[in-house]
A protein has these predicted regions:
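N-terminal start-of-chain detector that recognizes signal peptides
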Residues: 27, 78-80, 99-101
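Active-site recognition of the HExxH zinc-binding catalytic motif
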Residues: 107-120
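Canonical hydrophobic alpha-helical transmembrane segment
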Residues: 80-91
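Metalloprotease/metallohydrolase-associated module, dominated by Zn2+-dependent proteases
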Residues: 2, 6-69, 74-76, 87, ...
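Short pre-active-site segment immediately N-terminal to the catalytic Zn-binding motif
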Residues: 90-110, 137, 141-145
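Membrane-water interface of transmembrane alpha-helices
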Residues: 119-128, 195-197
């Protein structure tokens, strides 16, 4: 159940979860309840700013990965090799369905914990919290875009894995410890991507309440930036070359849009 005080924007997040579905029982607040000016601004920001930035970032990441794939030193480096091994472990576990309930519970718990951490970062209060296989919710006196969408682009378990590793590495600074870090990041990143892709098509109120188009573009762009940070951690990309690719791809995108605009003008004028 989701309850919303439209004056104070107090919200209760409650999602019912199983291996087949994830849905909110009711929605008292929706994107259409926002002022028309706010809706227009979000659509404009998503279309004119976030979408072009996401396209340029995706194109530049593809260029960087193409450069990296041609370098055996990068492909067989310790970070990339062990991250791929961790990802392979997730693929085996995810496809076997032997631990579906446990993995689903971890995702539900992580989803609600991320909401809770976002509330704390936003100086809000948490009044109730629940996460189990039957459902999960967080009740808070504060809501904003970051609180609503943070579980879709912040891989909580990967972040906690990195935090635990950082403490461990202070006392055990070995190559083995580094291998554990990279393999764990590969596993938990794939875990995050899989469940995020699984849950988004299931009519999530978190996305709809902020405008589905705006939310999807923002989540996509944020995940691209986190993926860039992960690749940089693995020394698989160069920030200097990435920025150069961004400038080049921005010019290409501008040329394409200009040509399309001229073509449309020729057809209708």
């Amino acid at each position: 159940m989701r309850q919303c005080n439209r004056d104070a924007w107090n919200k209760t997040y409650r999602a019912q979860v199983s291996s087949e579905y994830w849905e909110d029982e009711c929605q008292e607040f929706s994107f259409m309840d926002l002022p028309r000016r706010t809706r227009f601004i979000r659509h404009a920001v998503a279309t004119l700013i976030l979408l072009p930035l996401a396209l340029i970032t995706a194109m530049s990441l593809c260029d960087q990965l193409a450069h990296a794939s041609g370098s055996l030193n990068i492909l067989f480096s310790i970070p990339v090799w062990y991250a791929l091994m961790g990802a392979a472990v997730w693929v085996v576990l995810g496809s076997s369905r032997l631990f579906t309930s446990s993995l689903l519970y971890l995702y539900v718990l992580g989803h609600e914990l991320t909401h809770a951490l976002a509330v704390i970062c936003s100086h809000g209060s948490i009044h109730a919290f629940k996460a189990d296989l039957d459902g999960g919710y967080i009740q808070t006196d504060k809501n904003n875009i970051f609180i609503s969408l943070s579980p879709y682009f912040l891989p909580l378990w990967a972040m906690l894995w990195g935090l635990v590793w950082g403490v461990t590495y202070l006392f055990w600074p070995t190559v083995t410890c580094q291998a554990i870090l990279y393999s764990g990041l590969g596993f938990w990143w794939c875990f995050h991507l899989f469940w995020t892709a699984w849950i988004i098509p299931k009519d999530q109120p978190d996305l709809a309440d902020n405008g589905t188009f705006f939310s999807l573009i923002l989540v996509y762009f944020a995940n691209l930036l986190l993926f860039l940070a992960l690749l940089r951690l693995f020394n698989a990309v160069s920030l200097h070359r990435f920025l150069a690719d961004c400038i080049h791809n921005a010019e290409k995108l501008w040329d394409v849009l200009r040509d399309l605009a001229m073509l449309a003008a020729g057809l209708f004028l």
